[in-house]
């Protein structure tokens, strides 16, 4: 782990894109805040620019949540083929993509279309996981929470079979986090019970995407991402006690990295 931590100190100053650009596709009326949490976590992990693509109705609240986020709206409330085209355009700008946080009622074909038409590393999260199982996942890290891994077990029987057949990497958080990749199973034991609070899954997605956008390979990004989330949760718990929320964890990410 020390080897991975040291890579975070190698921040170049050659240009304004050296630390990567992350695109975030997510959000809905039911879950409006997820894209902002993902974006803030990515920025705190070192990403230079984050652009979120959200339904038109969410543009104002997401844009107003942080002046550090770039926000693009798509027409309507449902992520459909037209919105997918917007996402593909943004991915031309980005170094890594997160798709799925809060993405309620998205068209499955639209999610698959984005994955098939982009060639950057991608974090597939939450409601994008099930439709993504029919896509090429050789560039993907999956970050399911709770029962979101159910479709994986249903389709493949085990995480090992899933990763070996698809080439994907998967991070499962819990009392001990598990990172599964082709031929390997890793564990991370950082963290506290505070990380069961809402929004920490979005935080993990943002951290992982930031590392991917900084050109870390998928297994290392998944492993270090889980470690950063856990350590940040420990710092937040020490500072705030039992009332920790996801934004507290996000604000502790720079301390963890230092």
UniProtKB/Swiss-Prot annotation:
- Top-level EC class as recorded in UniProt: lyase
Q: Which reaction does it catalyse?
A: (6S)-NADHX + ADP = AMP + phosphate + NADH + H(+); (6S)-NADPHX + ADP = AMP + phosphate + NADPH + H(+)
The cofactors named for this UniProt entry are: Mg(2+)
Q: Which UniProt keywords apply?
A: ATP-binding, Lyase, NAD, NADP, Nucleotide-binding
User: Which CDD domains does the protein's record reference?
Assistant: YXKO-related
Residue ranges of every copy of the YjeF C-terminal domain listed in the record:
1-258
Supply the NCBIfam families for this chain: yjeF_cterm
- What name does the UniProt record give this protein? ADP-dependent (S)-NAD(P)H-hydrate dehydratase
